[in-house]
Amino acid sequence: FREAAAAGHTLLPLQRCIFSDHLTPVLAYRCLVREDDREAPSFLFESVEQASEGTNVGRYSVVGAQPAMEIVAKANQVTVMDHEMRTKEEQYAADPMTVPRDIMEQWNPQITLDGLPDAFCGGWVGFFSYDTVRYVETKKLPFSKAPEDDRNLPDIHLGLYNDVVVFDHVEKKTHVIHWVRLDCYHSIDEAYEDGKNRLEALLSRLHSSNVPTLSAGSIKLNVGQFGSALQKSTMSSEDYKKSVVQAKEHILAGDIFQVVLSQRFERRTFADPFEVYRALRIVNPSPYMAYLQVM
């Protein structure tokens, strides 16, 4: 650690490798995020691929919670929340995607370290909405011509995760990783000691004797018992069909080469979002599965 700091690195990883036979990615997520805390920024990345010889689970699963920093952008207005320094800054940015890049350029991370898995080990996690393209195509797609946002969702929401848990399903190991920002401390020794304490705290949450219980749930699906088909939507079936015809005409005319049409269906539910994800990962596994929770 001290050698890396002396070499000029300002973002340093501390890690502990443990057995993973007592823990699953789903349980690890629940250890880090309480069931009733549905606004805690966090994520779970998994992968399952269907092959001719059967189902193959991806080698790595990654869990993260409590980001050190968050960036939220909406129509050029950017909010940067540094939870480590306890600061909040609001600014105008013609291209908000430059903000996380500018922040990262302030640091020199140690990205090569023996023992770190060849997987995502920490960094920015979040989402970019379709309207993010308006920051690039400012003339053709200005925000002034954007459709009404009845959800009031941000264009960009990113979290910088210094604490991550990486499951290696091949070697049956779990890497618990904490990244230390030297700019948050007065000395390297202080940074190292606090980093060790934070890593131990992360480990203790995974090893807690009060491990949260996961509901057994039910994989049996019977959509008929939930009533009639979804009726509440953003458009009628006929309007959607007309949109498909219009899209084909634009493609034939050479205006576009592809288009993504969407139709939102809604239904009131009291289901827990994470429990819905647990069901989806069983009934519809995919190579890129993610559960993302933001404020």
Residue map of PLM features:
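Extended alpha-helical targeting/anchoring segments
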Residues: 1-295
